[in-house]
Amino acid sequence: MDPARKVEAPFHFYSGMDRPLGIQAQSLLEFLEAVKRVGTESLEFHLYRGDFERWIKDVLNSAFLHSRISALRRDGVRGEELRRRLVGVLEEWIGFYLYKRP
């Protein structure tokens, strides 16, 4: 999956129920940039509802990323540690994709 490929169903970031941030991501690269700038309360809200996993599995079709993000939820990470680890997972996958391309 090309990390720059735009998808039809963007991910919309919220800080809580019925509290949209007005930030969306239509590609994995946009998702990474949004993860770097939204508040940690938004990251926690989406991680523990399973929103990230669902979007990555259903829209981006990435079993690898799905399993790695599921592990973050199971580990119970929060706050800036969550951001750091989520960014690491995304950058690792993007780096792998770019490295393996001919």
Segments the model singles out, each with a brief description of its role:
Residues 1-102:
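Terminal, compositionally biased segments used for targeting/anchoring and flexible tails
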